[in-house]
C-alpha cells in the first residue's frame, strides 16, 4: 500500500496522477470495470431505442430536448466521458474519494485512504478499529487524513471526521455513480424536485429506462428519488446500494445530511435491527440510518413497550369481567319492602320532598302505624315472593351477594394503601438522634403562625379536641420531642420557661425531661405562662398524648 511520505500536505502528488489500488478487491475492480463498460454500451443502445420510440410516438419538441442526442459512434462518447473524468479528478484534488473512470460503476469502489491526497484531520483510533472490523478493505492509520475541498459546509464530528455533504444538484440515482460530486447545469432543479433523471455524463435530463434499473437496484414504485448514498457507512442513509429499497424507507429530500454525532455513536447498538428493514437477499446491511431520521422510531419505542407492560395487569381484568357478567340475583322482598314499593309513589306525590331518606322515614312511620291485619297482607305477599324466588333460583343463597361485597371492599383496600398502617413504635426509636436545641431554632410556618397570637393557643390547646388532633395529625410539622430519659420514667413533666429554667438547678434538671416547642414566648402574655394557666395544662395534656404516639415529622427530620 502507498504510505504517506511527509507531513500530509496538499501537494504531495500531481493532480492528474492515477492512484493504483493494491487492495484485496483489485480483481473485483477489473471485473466490475468490464461489467461497467458493457453497461455503458447498453445505456447507449437503450437511449437510442428510447429516442426512436418516443420520436415515433410523439413529436413534441420539449420531450425530445430532454432525451440525450443520438451518438453516431462510441468514440465520441468515450472522449466525452474521459473529459468529465479528467475534470473531476482535477476538481477533487485532496478529495475524500476519487471518481472512477466509469460513472455508471455498479459496485462501491473503496479507495486506499492512505493515498497522499488525503490530508487535514484524521480518524480516531476507535473509528479506525471499527472501520477495520466492518470494512476489511480499509486500512486506516491514525495519521491518515480526510478532506473534501468541494463540500460547502462539511459537518464535523466530535472526533474530527469531516462529513462530506452532497450538493443539491446531484444525480438522484446516486448508487449508480460512485462518489462523484460534480455539479450539473445551474438551470436544472434539484434532483428530488425534478421528475426526470439527469444523465450522469452530459447533465441532460431524461426519463429512466428499465434497463438502467438493473437487478442490482430493485426499486419500489415511489422511491426513485430516495436511493441511499453509496457510502452508506459514512453518510448515514437508510440502505446500501445493491440492496433492495422498501417502499417505507426513510424518505428524506436530500441524499446526504451532516452527522450530528460521532462515528462511535452512529455504530452503537442503539440502532436496533428492527428500525432498518433487512434486504430480502439476506445480505448484510451496513447502512446506518441517520439519527435525525431514526429519532421518531426511537421515540416510539417506549410507547411500543408500554402495551406489553400493560398486558401483565390485564389477565386479572377478564376475571373481574366474568364475575360482573354473572347476573346479580337480588334477594326476595320482605313485607316492608313490598309496602314501600306500593306506597312510595303516593308519598312522593303528596310531599314536596325529593330526598330519599326523608321519604323512607315517612314510609317507616306509616308502616308502624298500620294494624296487624293490614301488615298481614304484605307478609303474605312476601311469602309468595320467597317461594317464587326459590323456584327461579333453586341454588341461590344470600351469602353470595355478601361475599361479593366483601371482595369488592378488599380490592378497594388493596388498590389504595391506607395510611393508618403506620405504627408509632419505630418512630420513637429515631428520637435519640434528635436534639431539642435544633428543634427550637425555627418555628414552622403553618402552626407557628397559629401559635403567634395569644388567644389562639389557649383556646385551641385547652379544648378537649386538642389531644385528638395530636393523634390524628401524624404529619403535623410541630417539632415535638422528648428526651430518651424522660420517655422511660418521667410522668409529670414541667413546661420549661426560659427565665426560670436558667435560674435554678432543679429547673435545669427538669428541663432535660421537658417538652420543647417552637413557640415564641415573647408573643405570649405573662398570664399564659403561669403554672396554673390553661395553656400550661393543655401543654401537659398534649405531652401525655405525645408519649403514646409521636408525629411523623420527627421521623423525617431524623433522616435528614
From Swiss-Prot:
Ranges of biased composition (kind: Low complexity): 46-61, 453-472
GO cellular component: beta-catenin-TCF complex; chromatin; nucleus
Keywords, alphabetical: Activator, Developmental protein, DNA-binding, Nucleus, Repressor, Transcription, Transcription regulation, Wnt signaling pathway
Residues within the DNA-binding region(s): 329-397
Highest taxon of source: Eukaryota
Composition bias type Basic and acidic residues, residue spans: 19-45, 63-77
A biological-process GO annotation: heart development
A GO term for molecular function: RNA polymerase II cis-regulatory region sequence-specific DNA binding
Region (Disordered): 1-77, 297-328, 395-513
Family stated for the protein in its record: Belongs to the TCF/LEF family.
Role: Participates in the Wnt signaling pathway. Probably binds to DNA and acts as a repressor in the absence of ctnnb1, and possibly as an activator in its presence. Required early in development for dorsal specific gene activation and during gastrulation for repression of dorsal-specific genes in the marginal zone. Required for head formation and forebrain specification. Regulates anterior-posterior patterning in the neuroectoderm by repressing posterior neural fates.
Designated name of the protein: Transcription factor 7-like 1-A
Highest classification ranks of the organism: Eukaryota, Metazoa, Chordata, Craniata, Vertebrata
Gene name for this UniProt entry: tcf7l1a
Amino acid at each position: 500500500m502507498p504510505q504517506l511520505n511527509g507531513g500530509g500536505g496538499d501537494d504531495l502528488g500531481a493532480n492528474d496522477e492515477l492512484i493504483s489500488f493494491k487492495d484485496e478487491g483489485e480483481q473485483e475492480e477489473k471485473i466490475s470495470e468490464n461489467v461497467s463498460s458493457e453497461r455503458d454500451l447498453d445505456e447507449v443502445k437503450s437511449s437510442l431505442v428510447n429516442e426512436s420510440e418516443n420520436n415515433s410516438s410523439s413529436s413534441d419538441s420539449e420531450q425530445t430536448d430532454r432525451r440525450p442526442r443520438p451518438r453516431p459512434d462510441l468514440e465520441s462518447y468515450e472522449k466525452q466521458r474521459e473529459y468529465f473524468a479528467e475534470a473531476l479528478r482535477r476538481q477533487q484534488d485532496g478529495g475524500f474519494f476519487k471518481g472512477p473512470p466509469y460513472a455508471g460503476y455498479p459496485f462501491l469502489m473503496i479507495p486506499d485512504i492512505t493515498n497522499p491526497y488525503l490530508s487535514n484531520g484524521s480518524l480516531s483510533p476507535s473509528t479506525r478499529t471499527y472501520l477495520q472490523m466492518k470494512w476489511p478493505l480499509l486500512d486506516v492509520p491514525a495519521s491518515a487524513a480526510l478532506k473534501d475541498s468541494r463540500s460547502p459546509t462539511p459537518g464535523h464530528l466530535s472526533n474530527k471526521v469531516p462529513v462530506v455533504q452532497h450538493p443539491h444538484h446531484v444525480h438522484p440515482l446516486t448508487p449508480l455513480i460512485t462518489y462523484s460530486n460534480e455539479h450539473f447545469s445551474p438551470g436544472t432543479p434539484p434532483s428530488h424536485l425534478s421528475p426526470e433523471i439527469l444523465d450522469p455524463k452530459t447533465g441532460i435530463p431524461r426519463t429512466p429506462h428499465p434497463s438502467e434499473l438493473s437487478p442490482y437496484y430493485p426499486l419500489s414504485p415511489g422511491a426513485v428519488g430516495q436511493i441511499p448514498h453509496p457510502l452508506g457507512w459514512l453518510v448515514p442513509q437508510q440502505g446500501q446500494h445493491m440492496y433492495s429499497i422498501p417502499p417505507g424507507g426513510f424518505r428524506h429530500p436530500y441524499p446526504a445530511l451532516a452527522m450530528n454525532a460521532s462515528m462511535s455513536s452512529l455504530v452503537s447498538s442503539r440502532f436496533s435491527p428492527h428500525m432498518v428493514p433487512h434486504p430480502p437477499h439476506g445480505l448484510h446491511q451496513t447502512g446506518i440510518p441517520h439519527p435525525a431520521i431514526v429519532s421518531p422510531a426511537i421515540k416510539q419505542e417506549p410507547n411500543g413497550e408500554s402495551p406489553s407492560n400493560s398486558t401483565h395487569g390485564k389477565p386479572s381484568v377478564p376475571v373481574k369481567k366474568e364475575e360482573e357478567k354473572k347476573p346479580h340475583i337480588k334477594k326476595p322482598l320482605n313485607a316492608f319492602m313490598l309496602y314501600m314499593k306500593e306506597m312510595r309513589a303516593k308519598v312522593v306525590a303528596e310531599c314536596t320532598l325529593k330526598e330519599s331518606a326523608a321519604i323512607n322515614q315517612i314510609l317507616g312511620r306509616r308502616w308502624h302505624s298500620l294494624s296487624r291485619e293490614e301488615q298481614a297482607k304484605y307478609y303474605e305477599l312476601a311469602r309468595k315472593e320467597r317461594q317464587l324466588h326459590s323456584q327461579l333460583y333453586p341454588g341461590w343463597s344470600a351469602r353470595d351477594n355478601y361475599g361479593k361485597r366483601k371482595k369488592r371492599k378488599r380490592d378497594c383496600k388493596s388498590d389504595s394503601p391506607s395510611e393508618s398502617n403506620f405504627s408509632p413504635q419505630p418512630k420513637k426509636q429515631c428520637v435519640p438522634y434528635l436534639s431539642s436545641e435544633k428543634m427550637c431554632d425555627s418555628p414552622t410556618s403553618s402552626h407557628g403562625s397559629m401559635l403567634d397570637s395569644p388567644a389562639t393557643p389557649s383556646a385551641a390547646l385547652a379544648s378537649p379536641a386538642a389531644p385528638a388532633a395530636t393523634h390524628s395529625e401524624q404529619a403535623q410539622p410541630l417539632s415535638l420531642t422528648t428526651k430518651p430519659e424522660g420517655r422511660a420514667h418521667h410522668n409529670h413533666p414541667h413546661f420549661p420557661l426560659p427565665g426560670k429554667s436558667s435560674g435554678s438547678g432543679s429547673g435545669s434538671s427538669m428541663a432535660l425531661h421537658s417538652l420543647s416547642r417552637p413557640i415564641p414566648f415573647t408573643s405570649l402574655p405573662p398570664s399564659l405562662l403561669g403554672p396554673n394557666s390553661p395553656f400550661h395544662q393543655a401543654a401537659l395534656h398534649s405531652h401525655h398524648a405525645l408519649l403514646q404516639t409521636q408525629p411523623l415529622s420527627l421521623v423525617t427530620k431524623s433522616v435528614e
